[in-house]
Regions:
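Hydrophobic-core positions in well-structured secondary-structure elements of globular domains
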Residues: 1-223
C-alpha cells in the first residue's frame, strides 16, 4: 500500500498492517501460577483441569500426542481463527515446523478428541516487540519497470495478547525506499502442558498456511 512520496527526494513509504482479534466460545479456567521450564517461576496459566466444565473440551482439537513434550493441539475460536500450539517442534524454520506438525497429525492414530482424562495448561501471553531488518538496508534491486531502488529502512512491530478468554494480534511492517524515478502506485491421561519452550501459530480455519508464528522460550518476554 503506497501512502505517499516526495517527488524531490523520490522517497516512498510502504506500509502494511495485520490486525486480528479472537475469542473462545467459553472462557478457559484460570490456573494456579507455576513454573515455565527450569528458569522461570510464577507464570500465569489458563487451561483445563480435572474438575473443569466438559464444554471446554470442544474448544480443543488434538493433532497428535506422543508424550508430554511431543504434542500439538488447536484451540478453536468463535471467529474461526485457530491457535496451534506445539511442543517438541522439529524443523529449522516456521514453514518446516508447520509442515511437520501437519504430517504428524495425518499419521496419528490416537484419540483426537479432548477428554476427561486430558489436561491443558497454556501460559498467558502479552508482548510488544519491534524489529529492524538492518540486513535489508542499502540493498539495491530493480523494480518491475526497470528503475533502480534502494531500501533505507525496514521495520516490523508485533503486539500479541492471549488469555483464558481469547486474544488479539497487531502486526505492522514499514519499508522506506528510494527510487531513481517517480513511481506510480479414552485413554491414559494426556498432559497438554505448555510449561516449557513451545511453538505457536495463528491461522484462519479455511486457509492452508498460518499468518503468524512464534517460538516461546523466555516466558518473561511474553508476560
Amino acid at each position: 500500500m503506497l501512502l505517499g512520496y516526495s517527488e524531490w527526494y523520490k522517497k516512498y513509504l510502504f506500509y502494511t498492517m495485520l490486525k486480528k482479534e479472537f475469542n473462545f466460545e467459553n472462557d478457559f479456567n484460570e490456573l494456579d501460577a507455576g513454573a515455565f521450564g527450569t528458569k522461570y517461576k510464577d507464570v500465569k496459566y489458563f487451561g483445563i483441569e480435572k474438575n473443569s466444565d466438559s464444554k471446554l473440551y470442544d474448544q480443543v482439537e488434538v493433532l497428535y500426542y506422543n508424550a508430554e513434550n511431543d504434542f500439538a493441539i488447536i484451540l478453536n475460536t468463535k471467529e474461526g481463527e485457530q491457535v496451534i500450539l506445539c511442543r517438541g517442534a522439529e524443523g529449522g524454520n516456521f514453514a518446516t515446523i508447520y509442515n511437520n506438525i501437519m504430517e504428524k497429525a495425518k499419521t496419528y492414530t490416537g484419540n483426537k478428541k479432548f477428554t476427561k482424562n486430558d489436561f491443558l495448561k497454556v501460559p498467558n501471553i502479552k508482548f510488544n516487540t519491534k524489529k529492524e531488518f538492518n540486513e535489508l538496508c542499502n540493498k539495491e534491486f530493480l523494480a518491475k519497470d526497470g528503475d533502480r531502488c534502494t531500501i533505507e529502512q525496514a521495520i516490523q512491530t508485533i503486539e500479541l495478547e492471549m488469555d483464558k478468554s481469547g486474544g488479539k494480534l497487531k502486526s505492522e511492517a514499514a519499508i522506506v525506499m528510494t527510487k531513481e524515478m517517480a513511481l506510480m502506485p479414552e485413554e491414559e491421561n494426556r498432559y497438554f502442558y505448555l510449561n516449557d519452550e513451545f511453538t505457536m501459530f495463528l491461522k484462519e480455519k479455511d486457509k492452508d498456511t498460518p499468518y503468524f508464528a512464534a517460538n516461546i522460550q523466555d516466558i518473561t518476554l511474553f508476560q
